[in-house]
């Protein structure tokens, strides 16, 4: 079992794949270094002398600078490493020399649902979408009271509550309206009941205008203040929606029609070594089969955005990426916040030292394929291949945004563990084996076997593709089995 990994030949640190005790001789890539102190799993150890002010190199990239001299064997973390990040950056488009679409592979098929508009779906559910937080409990009761309608090919009746839709103005109000309308369009929802109160800011006419053309058999509306008994009215509508949803049956669909979101949360020092590279390899494999993937968490690209921007397929896509990234930075700066204060206490405990450290691991999920498009919050994926999406690092908000963009399912890597699931089935992928063993009720797939020396990234990526096809065909994720699913705007 390997003790550590030297990610790039030019790195001046290695990452402990397992806890390394003080005095242990670590041998990796022809380097022999004795640990001068205990090195926790996922944390960094210097393998070359690093002087005060000198860059700490990991992934072949500066992740910060040393704040004190460090000899080989020194633990390198928040006590002796500081970020190099500041504010906005003026980027230039320097296309990667090997920038080209990956070679195509014949797609496998999954057993999904074909909607009347031709889109593919992997679930056949009825959704209740409240337009305002005041009707949240009403929506929950409607779900509870009508579970008998979940029969035949209908796989669930769910509501996605939120506190918004009123007391919002301007951009906030527009974002709420846009996001909720995007959820109504999601193909995994065979049928949708949009639930209004009646007096909220987000009025029915506004919502219908945002929604655009829709199938009147698939989408129904109910305004609670307009009826004597909203529960009886909902029962009648839901029966109609169930009759509509029940006509869909699973059939073979090529994986080229899948849209998969890619997310990390509760990251640790192994995220960029095991789980995220596995997801990146999966992204390449799905793209070769004609499918689409979505990468977001823009603030967690800061410091590593160059990896992605040089892979934009053309200058127009590069300009959109530059605008998105600097727009997020300007948002922080305009609120008198620094751009680099992102890693959480759990991230740091797991070995992530700076935002650059976290970002270099985060972008591994993007694989090696060209970035084909950059899309806004609430906008749909329209281009095959790898897409970047405007969204924050927050787990709930970014996963909801990927669902709204049309992601059929989401791959969520984690080193610390999280039970959260978006409305789209959310697969939890552990970076380390101890987490997979401890939280078996949360984790769907373990890439810690890479750190254990049991499998390669190619092998875990193939296993992940196989699992995605099974989930797309109806196999439930751990979160689905627990009934976990929610949104945040």
Could you tell me what each predicted segment is?
Residues 1-409, 416-489:
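Metallocofactor- and cofactor-centric catalytic cores in central/energy metabolism, strongly enriched
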